Structures are given as C-alpha cells and as structure tokens.
C-alpha cells in the first residue's frame, strides 16, 4: 500500500492474499473505528491525542516561545530533562530523529531513571554551566521523576537561589498534582498535559513540543504532521488507511501465522528511540490477558553481527517490521584513498554511504525472506520534523486498532501498577 508519505510493503509475506485479507478484516476494522470515534472503546475518553491535531495551539505555542526566549535571555546552554516511560522515550525519539538538523546550541541531559551513576554523571556535566530544569509528570508522584526532581531542583536552587524559578518548567496536569502546587508557590512555568492523554500517547503534547523548540526545531511542523496524518487516516477503508492496514497485518501474522514476536528493525542508530517508542506503544497497549505479540527491535547493521545469526537460522517464531526512511538529511561520498587503496575499497567509490546502507537493507531482507522470515517494510518519505509528527500519529492509530483487534483496552496499563504497589510498600510510602 502506497501513500504520499508512507508505504507499507507486503511482498515479503508468505501466503498473503490482499483481497482475502481485506475481506476478512474490513468489517471488524470499521466497527472498531466507529467505536473509537464515539468513545465506546474501554476507557474511550482517553483519546485526547486524536483530537489534538485539530485544536487551536496558538496559546500553547506562545507559552513555549516565551520559555524559549527566557532561556535564551538567560544564556541557558544545558537542559536537564526528567521524565519516564512515554514522557521520556518519545521526546528522545524526536530529538534523535531530528538531531542532524538541530539548530540551537543546547545540550539536553536525559535522566529517565534513578541510577545514582547517571544522576551523578549529569550533575558533573552541568556543573558551572548555565542550565535549566524541565520535568514531566502528570501526578508529580511517579517515583523516578519525583526523586530526580528533588535532587536537581536542590542543585538549581543552590546555584541560582530564588531565581531558580526562572529556569524551571513543570509539565503536568492542569489543576491537580504535586507539581501544580509547586508551580503555584514558586512561580515555575507550567505547561499542561490534557487529562485525557495517556503517557505513551503524549509525545507531541507540551513536553515534546517544548524540547523540540528548545533544540531549534519547529513545533508547528510536528503538529502539521499529526494533522496531515489524521486527515489521511480519517476513513477506515483498508485500501487507503495504511495504519489500520499495518495493524491488521500484525493481527494476521499473530493469529493466522502463529508468530509470537515482532522484531522492528531500522538501519540508523539515531532511530533507536523511535524503535523504543514503537515497542512501548504496542507493548503497553497490547500486553494484557496473556494474549499479545511480543514487540522487540534490532538496529542493523550493528545487530547483524550478533542477532543476525538467530534471525537467519534460528526458530522462525517472529516476523520483522523494517523501517526505512527514503530521503535523509545528509549523505557522504566515500573519498579516494590517500593510501593507494590498501583497504581495497575502491569498488565503492561510485556509491554514497546511504546507497551502501540501503544495499545492506535490501540484501538482509532478501536473505531473511529466503530463510522463511515474514517481513513488513514501512518506508517513510523523508527525515523531517513534519515526518516525525506524521509517523507518531500514524503509530498511535495503528496501536489503537491493533490492540482493539485483540480485544484489549489499549488505554490502560494495570500490570504496571502491581510492581508500584509492592515497591512503595517496601519503601514505606503511606
């Protein structure tokens, strides 16, 4: 299936007949689509991410611009960002995906856990720098950002005293939660996460938009990407809706082909967090009731020298989803050797780095397919701010449909609460 911005290639799926496939899934997809639009799915009110692209963002963008100007006036060079789960993975995915085009001279230090090693390393890195603190947490009580916020807020206060408030941004609920109280008391900038947007669907809420802006990317282009995707995916027809098509393919491979694992693959290390975001969206939305695909990922060509052996000759209980970006920001030519071709690479002189990488991709797809691996290939048109917004919304729609086809509530995560209750009991929180 081909559209202007994204192509789903199914020619490396064994036994796949598109006409039979669409006939099998179309009615159920139509039903789920209408239930989603009418908020009739379990926790169906948690669809704020779907209505977000159509909203007027002038007020939010004005707030973000004000923060960016203030940080610029304060000559901020480093940002410490605190967040966990979707409030971390997605934001990191944006910045890594767009890193070659970063225009602002800002260094973002992510603190996504309570590792003393990582916290100490970031504290050393910002010592003597002009830095600011951004925290994302709806409740303000999630352990990881709460602990790290105490630590780094103390550091910020020690360095800047009362003026630390000018360098602090809280991204949280509109009216409730610990961070709201702190913001009101100390005058921190406060950006609001709508209460009907869950963490893994919140990448392009204020957290992602603010960090994108601070790093010199255009949040309007991210939002335009989501709006374009929403418009293109408004119809549930599997002949045109590529996100639903992909969701149904995953279900077909899981139920009909009995494949239990999806290995999502990309060929650039900068896409690692995009793959992690894919894993979180599907894993947290579908991992319920003992009935779900197990989403994992590999970065090629690096992992070809480890996991490549398993994929080629191991048990075929998995399928691959390969993500390729058609147009890159940059390319490089292999230069002529200054050492008389002693590395014997002159046969590559007519090829660019991207050509070599794409050739490796084609060869791996062919090799794995010959070894009975089913492969879906997703091709994104370009590596741009707009494209990230488009693909993130596309993945969110695919997640909603895929999990709903399995009969799950795609908007909750009750399993995550089990360890939290045990952990807080052991730590003594009342």
UniProtKB/Swiss-Prot annotation:
Coiled-coil intervals: none
NCBIfam families attached to this UniProt entry: PRK14097.1
CDD domains referenced in this protein's UniProt entry, alphabetically: SIS_PGI_1, SIS_PGI_2
A molecular function (GO) term: carbohydrate derivative binding
Described function: Catalyzes the reversible isomerization of glucose-6-phosphate to fructose-6-phosphate.
Protein's UniProt keywords contain Repressor: no
Known catalytic reactions: alpha-D-glucose 6-phosphate = beta-D-fructose 6-phosphate
Active site positions: 284 (proton donor), 305, 420
Pfam families associated with the record: PGI
Species, as recorded: Mycoplasma pneumoniae (strain ATCC 29342 / M129 / Subtype 1) (Mycoplasmoides pneumoniae)
UniProt KW keywords: Cytoplasm, Gluconeogenesis, Glycolysis, Isomerase
GO cellular component term, pick one: cytosol
Protein name according to UniProt: Glucose-6-phosphate isomerase
């Amino acid at each position: 299936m081909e559209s202007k911005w994204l192509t789903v290639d199914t020619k490396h799926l064994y036994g796949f007949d598109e006409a039979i496939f669409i006939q099998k899934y179309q009615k159920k997809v139509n039903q789920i689509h209408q239930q989603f639009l009418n908020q009739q799915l379990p926790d169906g009110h948690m669809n704020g991410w779907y209505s977000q692209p159509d909203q007027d963002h002038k007020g939010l963008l004005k707030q973000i611009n004000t923060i960016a100007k203030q940080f610029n006036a304060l000559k901020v060079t480093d940002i410490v960002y605190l967040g966990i789960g979707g409030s971390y993975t997605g934001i990191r995915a944006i910045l890594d995906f767009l890193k070659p085009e970063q225009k602002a001279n800002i260094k973002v230090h992510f603190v996504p856990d309570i590792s003393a090693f990582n916290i100490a390393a970031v504290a050393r890195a910002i010592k003597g720098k002009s830095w600011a603190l951004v925290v994302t947490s709806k409740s303000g009580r999630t352990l990881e950002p709460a602990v790290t916020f105490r630590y780094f807020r103390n550091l910020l206060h020690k360095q800047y005293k009362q003026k630390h408030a000018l360098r602090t941004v809280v991204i949280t609920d509109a009216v409730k939660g610990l961070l709201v109280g702190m913001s009101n008391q100390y005058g921190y900038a406060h950006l609001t996460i709508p209460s009907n947007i869950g963490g893994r669907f919140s990448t392009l809420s204020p957290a992602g938009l603010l960090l994108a802006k601070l790093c010199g990317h255009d949040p309007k282009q991210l939002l335009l990407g989501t709006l374009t995707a929403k418009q293109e995916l408004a119809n549930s027809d599997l002949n045109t809706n590529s996100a639903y098509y992909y969701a149904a393919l995953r279900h077909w491979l899981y139920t009909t082909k009995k494949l239990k694992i999806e290995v999502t693959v990309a060929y650039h290390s900068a896409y690692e967090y995009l793959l992690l975001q894919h894993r979180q969206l599907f894993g947290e939305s579908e991992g319920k009731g003992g009935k779900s695909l197990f989403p994992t990922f590999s970065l090629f060509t690096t992992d070809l020298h480890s996991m490549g052996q398993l994929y080629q000759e191991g048990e075929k209980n998995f399928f691959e989803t390969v993500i390729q970006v058609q147009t890159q920001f940059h390319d490089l030519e292999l230069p002529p050797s200054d050492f008389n071709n002693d590395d014997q690479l002159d046969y590559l002189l007519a090829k660019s780095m991207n050509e070599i990488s794409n050739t490796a991709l084609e060869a791996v797809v062919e090799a794995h397919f010959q070894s009975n691996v089913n492969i879906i290939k997703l091709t994104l048109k370009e590596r741009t701010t707009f494209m990230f917004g488009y693909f993130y919304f596309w993945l969110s729609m695919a997640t909603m449909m895929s999990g709903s086809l399995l009969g799950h509530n795609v908007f909750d995560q009750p399993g995550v609460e089990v360890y939290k209750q045990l952990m807080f009991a052991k730590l003594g929180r009342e």
